[in-house]
A protein has these predicted regions:
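C-terminal segment of classical bacterial N-terminal signal peptides
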Residues: 2-9
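N-terminal amphipathic/hydrophobic interface segments
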Residues: 10-124
Length: 124
């Protein structure tokens, strides 16, 4: 008998990358373990760009909280705008609320709250 073993490794999620902000700070008292970004914030993760007015990036958890004029752009096909969003870089899941508009070449969705799974490209 011949057995073939395949080396299966869990893929390690890439980290959320801070590309730009007017100001960055760390305040362990108010928001522990977060990088506080304000003004013209731009962060990226595996082909998606987030822009907003203010963000908290929790680097250990690979997690983002974005505030004010939030936009998520995935390639040239998906645009999501909202007042507030959260994004989990470990599982590529986004949550957005507050005047949410999601646009793709096929459709436009307007709602108050949305969850988006980047792995399956499903919104619910």
């Amino acid at each position: 008998m011949l057995f073939t073993l395949t080396n299966l490794k869990a893929q390690k999620a890439s980290k959320i990358n801070v590309e730009y902000s007017d100001f960055a700070d760390i305040n362990q008292t108010e928001i522990p373990d977060a990088l506080l970004l304000t003004g013209n914030v731009r962060v990226s993760h595996d082909g998606v760009i987030f822009t907003c007015n203010k963000a908290y990036v929790f680097q250990k958890e690979n997690y983002l909280k974005a505030f004010g004029e939030v936009q998520m752009v995935q390639g040239d096909t998906l645009f999501l705008n909202s007042k507030y969003a959260e994004y989990n870089g470990e599982v590529k899941q986004a949550y957005a609320t507050g005047n949410v508009i999601m646009r793709s070449p096929e459709s436009t969705l307007v709602t108050d709250t949305i969850n988006f799974n980047r792995n399956t490209q499903e919104a619910f």
